[in-house]
């Protein structure tokens, strides 16, 4: 698939240069691109709510005109699963990239823990001290979580694809960094007996814990969002009962933010930047191709404000309003 970010940048520069509005540097473009993508991403949820209201009012379409289905597919593409690392007795850090929490599950059945052997590559997990086959508990389909506290990929999850030997597994995704200071600790969890942890308010948890009849237990655990520590405030959860402390057993399913776009380049002898898709920090937009026009319009608006060129901002706004008008149904008919 062709790079969306390069097409968007070329179009933005073409429009901006047509009337001598000024040059947009790669660094400035990346800043505008990040904000534009965030604006559109957050608007998905407002659109979803709006179309649900229209559906209830029987003014939405079906089949190819089912806008809600398309929005759900886009939002679901940002769904992620990640194990939570506990930073206190029952205090767990939420993922850095979470936008909203879908659900948090408790995996009570731990089948194996260990430390990766240096040299694990690709989608393989090698632990020279493990006993995957003879132990008889590890099986394909089980969840494996990176439990390294403070690691580069801490909390990253994957599934066991196959048990290759006593010391080697094939996993669906390599969420471990096996350098000399890499992420090496893991936990393997059975998918049987998984319990959803119910979210409750700070006020409700006080009353639940005040009576032995309502206190959360392992069969009906609960969590409070926004428990604080000396590092993070509002990006943690407190899980009850306090006995749920085993690393990797609390797993979140959430909608993440899109990754920051980054138009990367190599500098030519004349000083002109040349698009370089092979750069290690290259990142395309994560939005669907259908949002390419929206990205262009929003970036033009930000660029116009930056160079104090009101006509460029107005052009982007006018194009965006035109698109919104075409996409909105006429509710008065």
Model-inferred region functions:
Residues 110-189:
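Autoprocessing Asn-cyclization modules and mimics
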């Amino acid at each position: 698939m062709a790079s969306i970010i390069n097409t968007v940048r070329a179009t933005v520069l073409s429009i901006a240069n047509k009337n001598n509005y000024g040059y947009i540097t790669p660094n400035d473009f990346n800043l505008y691109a990040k904000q534009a993508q965030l604006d559109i991403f957050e608007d998905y949820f407002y659109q979803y709510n709006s179309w649900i209201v229209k559906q209830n009012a029987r003014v939405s379409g079906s089949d190819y005109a089912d806008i809600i289905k398309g929005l759900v597919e886009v939002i679901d593409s940002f769904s992620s699963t990640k194990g939570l690392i506990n930073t206190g007795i029952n205090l767990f850090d939420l993922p850095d990239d979470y936008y909203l929490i879908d659900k948090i599950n408790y995996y009570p059945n731990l089948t194996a823990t260990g430390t990766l052997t240096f040299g694990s590559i690709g989608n393989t997990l090698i632990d020279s001290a493990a006993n995957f086959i003879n132990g008889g508990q590890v099986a394909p389909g089980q969840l494996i979580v990176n439990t390294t506290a403070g690691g580069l990929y801490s909390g990253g999850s994957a599934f066991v694809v196959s048990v290759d030997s006593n010391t080697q597994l094939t996993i669906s995704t390599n969420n471990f960094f096996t350098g000399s200071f890499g992420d090496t600790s893991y936990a393997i969890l059975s998918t049987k007996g998984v319990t959803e942890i119910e979210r409750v308010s700070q006020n409700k948890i006080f009353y639940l814990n005040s009576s032995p009849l309502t206190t959360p237990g392992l069969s009906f655990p609960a969590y409070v969002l926004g428990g604080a520590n000396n590092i993070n405030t509002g990006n943690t959860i407190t899980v009850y009962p306090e006995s749920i402390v085993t690393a990797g057993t609390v797993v979140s399913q959430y909608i993440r933010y899109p990754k920051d776009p980054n138009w990367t380049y190599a500098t030519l002898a004349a000083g002109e930047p040349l698009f370089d898709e092979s750069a290690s920090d290259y990142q395309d937009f994560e939005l669907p191709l259908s949002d390419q026009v929206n990205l262009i319009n929003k970036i033009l608006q930000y660029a116009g404000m930056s160079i104090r060129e009101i006509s460029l901002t107005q052009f982007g706004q006018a194009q965006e309003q035109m698109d919104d008008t075409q996409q909105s149904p006429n509710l008065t008919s």
